Amino acid sequence: VTVFLAVILVMLIGSFSCSKGDYSGKVETVAIGATPIELNALIYVADEYRFFTNNGVQVVFKDYDTGVAAVDGLLKREVDMALTTEFVIVGKSLQKQDVLDLATIDKSMLFYIIARTDRGIKTTADLKGKRIGVPRQTITGFYLGRMLELNGMRIQQVTTVDTKASDPAGTIAGGDVDAIVTWEPQVTQIRQQMGNGVIIWPAQSGQVSFWSIASTPRWINQHPDLVRQLLKSLAQAEEYIIQHPAEAKKILQRRLKLDDTYIATVWSQNQFLLSLDQSLILAMEDEGRWMIKNNLTREKQIPDFMNYIYVDGLKAVKPEAVKIIR
């Protein structure tokens, strides 16, 4: 009986992964630049259950420390696509660099400000005059600036220090900075290592971060069918996560070597859904104005961010997920 049930289970899994996208054409390779974090859940599930290959896509991964590093790799043609925040796409648009957002694959609330209590920091007001670590050109600088503004301060009233995104725990534990802005799972790691030696605040001030899959106009124009095939695979992964959250969590745990407690904590802080909606545009405009206000660009006006979003791919695969007002 046990053997019979096991065979049935294998058949059901195989049916789920194959019936969604039987593909008899040429399988093409797509190189994706990514930071290995749980925000990539749709990507990892699609890879694990062969949704990519069943739709004619062979995905290979190249790891980067940050989304901005992944996009820089994209622009250097090291990869075909990059996973990044909308903030990076905003920055590239203000630099007149061609990067298009294909779809949001996750909305999250995973960024935090972590401060050392032995530096006299008990409230956010105590951050004034302190050295705060933020990885260069990432969305952490925006979140820090916004949080300071909401607490009556300006980012010029702190000293920002360009820190390595790969080792925030070492940076704050080593005492090079008084505080740091970082994201999960590093936040949990620092909390476990330093305990009461740090105080932690949410950094995003209620604004979700959009984790996007991006590419260049050149590559998209050369591979429109491949874009649709990849997004179709992610739509199938989204359906799988909705129907089988426990199995999806196990995939993340195996892939990223995460424990049960961590996954249980952060799962609800993510929305693993494909989308292109108006809230993305509003966030990009807000971030663009912030960059201009803080002289992080030579531009004086924000661009039309619709010019940096490619809607045709997602419209073809999941039209109800496109909710942008033109």
Task: Enumerate the predicted regions with their spans.
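Short amphipathic alpha-helical segments at helix boundaries and their inter-helical linkers
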Residues: 79-83, 174, 270-286, 313-322
